Design a protein with these regions (language model features):
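Hydrophobic alpha-helical transmembrane segments
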Residues: 1-48, 63-70, 77-78, 84-219
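Generic anion/oxyanion-binding catalytic loop in active/binding sites
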Residues: 60
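Juxtamembrane transmembrane-helix boundary signature
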Residues: 49-54
Length: 219
């Protein structure tokens, strides 16, 4: 019933990840490439690699040709295929590059907003998805609705503005929009939503929020 507060939990995660980034780059002055690798590694380690596991399974399912049921079966098996490795590499390398492209002085704020945006995307996905009957994502999907999504988006956008001005709102909005994109992709390929799609959406939405905020800042 508290799925709508996930962006604010993401904010707490973002404070920790952002503080780590500040330590690595601002205080210790490590080279930006090494720092980006350490920050991204810390981020996925801190959340227990759960979302990364979902991303790999999602990639495997996306590579399968056939019915949604066949795709879900592949997504749920324990083996790792080429699709999973490819998605892991693509999302990972772009996220790493985005962190490495961030202005050092702003690293804390960018990382903080990106984690809020990632969770904003997850609850957007949950709002518009139909759950798999015995999937772990069912509990999150059933507790979300459009009113709660709007409330969460307004509050998260306000926080984003306080953290990073207009670019903070842009990052949060990107999280919401990318959540809708994941919904459309998942419905086309799987019809029903699973916990693996939830995990994949977190990684994709964080990446897209980072990319768009940094790109616009550099303009």
């Amino acid at each position: 019933m508290f799925t709508w507060i996930w962006p604010f939990i993401g904010g707490l995660i973002g404070i920790i990840v952002g503080a780590f980034g500040f330590l690595i780059l601002d205080l210790l002055h490590l080279p930006i490439i090494i720092g980006a690798a350490l920050i991204y590694s810390f981020s996925i380690w801190f959340t227990g690699f759960h979302h990364l596991d979902g991303l790999i399974d999602f990639g495997d399912g996306m590579m399968v040709h056939g019915s949604p049921e066949k795709k879900i079966d592949v997504m749920r098996d324990k083996r790792i295929g080429t699709g999973g490795i490819a998605y892991l590499f693509m999302i990972g390398i772009i996220t790493f590059a985005a962190i490495g492209s961030s202005p050092v002085i702003l690293i804390f704020y960018i990382l903080l907003v990106s984690e809020i945006a990632a969770k904003m995307g997850i609850i957007t996905w949950a709002t518009f998805s139909k759950p798999f009957p015995d999937g772990t994502g069912r509990y999150f999907i059933e507790s979300m609705n459009k009113k709660l999504l709007l409330l969460s988006f307004i509050l998260a956008s306000a926080i984003g503005f306080l953290i990073f001005n207009i670019l903070g709102i842009v990052g949060i909005t990107m999280g919401l929009l990318s959540g809708i994109i994941i919904v459309l992709i998942a419905k086309k390929n799987f019809k029903l939503a699973t916990g693996d799609v939830l995990g994949a959406s977190n990684e994709v939405e964080r990446m897209l929020a980072l990319v768009i905020m940094i790109t616009l800042f550099m303009l």
